[in-house]
């Protein structure tokens, strides 16, 4: 993924925080001349200093067999928004699109049943703590869920993160972008404005 130096995000904690807040990702891998794509929620942890991502597919989804033991790419996308030159104090710039994204590559490994059970508890607790508790209390129902999925882990080989938040513009222009994003009012605009303000305060 091409990321100019001034847009690169190197703060490991920020990257982790981002993929925890936006856990829905694209899982991509080549099959012949095609690129196969799966959309799934993912959780992560750090093992020996490396980011390890965990997810699952339905057992009747044939993609997990094709991805098993192969190098895959995982893409997380956060807020993104059109940026108008009208928002700049100096209006010689071109229209552009700001965004936040993380790209992880690694080999997909299918997990054994016990690890799958542990993963499902963690995923349920992360996404819906109350429901996760109910699932553990209803053992038969919970075991049925385990039977119907294939869980996997991807230990990161590379992690690339891009925070394209107008860092290549003077502070006066960045303030103008933030003000107009806040006026836009949609969720992505508000999130992006908040991330820009946080970065500008550093």
Feature-to-residue mapping (PLM):
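Binding-site signature for planar aromatic cofactors or substrates
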Residues: 1-202
